Every structure is written in C-alpha cells, then in structure tokens.
Amino acid sequence: TEEFEKMIAKDELIEYARYVDNYYGTPRVYVEEQLEAGKDVVLEIEIQVALKVKEKFPDTLLLFVTPPSAQELRSRLVGRGTETMDVIEYRMSRAKEEAEGMEKYDYLIINDDLMECVEEMHRIIQGEHRRSFRNHEFIEHMKEELKGE
C-alpha cells in the first residue's frame, strides 16, 4: 500500500482505484512502452477511471462489456461460488452504478458467449486501426506515390 501511494504521488500510474480494500492501477511506463512498440493495451477498469484515462489519452477506445442481463450477471456471480452474498450484492450495486454510464463508451459489447465477445473486441480494435485519421502517414505516402504515376 505504501509503495502504491508513492507511485500515485509521483504520477507513475495512468489510472488507479481502490476496490474492496485493495489498490489496483496501471504503471504509466509499461503502457507507454507497449504503445511505442505498436501494441494495443487493454485495461479492465471501472467507468470513473476509464473516463479519466480518456481525458488524459483522447485516442483511448472505450469498450463496455456486459452480460446480456442483470439476471445473468447475478447468476454468474453466484455460480462462481467464490464470494459471499454481501460481496455479490455489493458487486450488483456497482454494476447498477456502472450501467448509468454505458452511453459514455465508444462501443457496447454483450458478453453472451466468451469467444464471440473476444472476437468482437478484436474486430472493433482492428477496425479502429484502419480508420483514416489514424493512418495519415500512409495516406500522405500513397498520395505522393500516385503523383509520380
């Protein structure tokens, strides 16, 4: 906890949150290294934190992944058998709060089938890479080449 608080004070985390008495966060250096290497970085974070990340990094793509219904969410939480009913009720309450901000995300993905959900996330991310405003360098290069034809 003390080391984490030092990292917060030094602005070494892109995002962080305290959840169920534990700190969670993403080191800035790690994310910057991955992005510079041309890799995508996927963060599983709460809405308030996601919106802060989007403020700091406007190119951030926000995907809201949700089960098909509240009943299914409860069923999955209970089915795990790893949490008490108090924790399940708390998580359901948090889900209700998070759902209030669904429209602030760029995409909504309904996780009815895990593999389909993963494939859809992949398609969305790949599609974002292909958007023209993200490919300015290629576009300019192509225009220059075509001028010489």
Locations of regions flagged by a protein language model:
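Ras-like small GTPase catalytic G-domain
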Residues: T60, A70-E72, V78-E100, M115-E116
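ATP-dependent small-molecule kinase phosphotransfer cores
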Residues: T1-V41, Q48
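Conserved catalytic network of the ASCE P-loop NTPase/AAA+ motor domain
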Residues: E33-E36, K54-P58, E100-M102
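Conserved AAA+ ATPase "sensor/coupling" helix adjacent to the nucleotide-binding pocket
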Residues: K10-I14, R76-E83, I124-G127
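NTP-dependent small-molecule kinase module
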Residues: T82, E100-E149
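Residue-level signature of catalytic and energy-coupling elements of molecular machines
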Residues: F4, V42, A95, I109
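Conserved phosphate-donor/acceptor-positioning beta-strand/loop module used by diverse small-molecule
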Residues: V41-E46, E55-G79, N111
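Short, well-ordered alpha-helical microsegments
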Residues: V49-L51, C117-V118
